[in-house]
Amino acid sequence: MKLAKVGQDIETGNAAWTFDGKVADTFVSHVSQSVPLYEKGHDLVCQLSDYFVDKTSTVYEIGTSTGELIKKVAQHNAHREGARFIGIDPVGPMVEKAKEHCADTPSVTIIEDDARNFEFEKSDLIISYYTIQFIPPRDRQQLFDKLYEALNWGGALIMFEKVRAPDARFQDMAVSMYNEF
């Protein structure tokens, strides 16, 4: 299979995207350049967390990759002493980077696991930031059910995701804006 270069020495082919190997070393730079408003989305998640996180909260991020977002959310909520922030990712090199990145933020724990298999505690906030697209479609509903069951009453799932527009015209607009980015 011929692999295509997608930036920062990252290669992929049809149905062959992986986060293993050296991807963790350049992930933050790559995703910031390839996903429009990626960091702005982090800021929005932090602002939304104000409505759900208190000093007794458990907060999860599934697909935490290098831990950038879970660390930002934890630092944003540092005044809520006692809150716990848990990043989950199934890819060893990403987990290693996340643990290094979050080492100076004691309220953050990084766990290597697949969200589909993880035993969630009750939580007030679960974050899925461009993660569900990497879950096989046949497993998505079961994962959504699991995340819903893990939420306390009044809790939230904040999800950013690439989606197909319901109308071809809007899909064309979104693709055009993405390509211009």
Whereabouts are the PLM-identified features?
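N-terminal, positively charged/glycine-rich alpha-helical extensions of SAM-dependent methyltransferases
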Residues: M1-T26
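A short glycine-rich, Lys/Arg-flanked "PGG" loop and its adjoining helix->strand segment in the class I
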Residues: Q141-W153
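Short catalytic micro-motifs in class I SAM-dependent methyltransferases
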Residues: Y130-F134
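Short conserved loop adjoining the S-adenosyl-L-methionine
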Residues: N117-E121
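A conserved beta-strand element that flanks and buttresses the S-adenosyl-L-methionine
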Residues: I127
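Class I SAM-dependent methyltransferase SAM/SAH-binding core
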Residues: Y60, T66-R116
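Conserved class I S-adenosyl-L-methionine
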Residues: I158-F181
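Conserved alpha-helix/loop element of class I SAM-dependent methyltransferases that forms part
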Residues: L37-K55
